[in-house]
């Protein structure tokens, strides 16, 4: 089967406001670093991670996904009724069943004719 008129028209993301840097973590671990004679900067050097971002406790992944989907839909300029599929990819879920993609589909206001696929680990 060949598909026609399929494309990624818009891309959106939502970043959490809370930022915790590797330096912040090392500051909390300073007594341990001093006791073990570890140089500052080791965490970023070993992980390659400069900063981490966190949503507030209790934030549901599907809520962030729905917010982001709405942004992407708006940026695309495509009418909601023209969407044929929603593919939701995430490591985290709101609950075991139904799939988080179902809630995102509903919250984004996509039509019932729009197929839903939830890709998770």
Regions found by a protein language model. Give the residues of each.
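Active-site nucleophile and cofactor-binding loops and adjacent substrate-binding regions
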Residues: 57-59, 115-121
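Short glycine-rich or small-residue beta-strand-to-loop segments that form or flank ligand, phosphate
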Residues: 85-91, 118
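Compact, aliphatic and Gly/Pro-tolerant "microcore" segments centered on a short helix or tight beta-hairpin
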Residues: 104, 112-117
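N-terminal start-of-chain detector that recognizes signal peptides
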Residues: 58-59, 90-92
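Conserved "HGTGT" condensation-loop signature of ketosynthase/thiolase-family condensing enzymes
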Residues: 1-84, 105-110
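Short Gly/Thr/Asp-enriched flexible loops that form oxyanion-binding sites at enzyme active sites
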Residues: 92-105
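Poly-acidic low-complexity segments
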Residues: 79, 99, 118-121
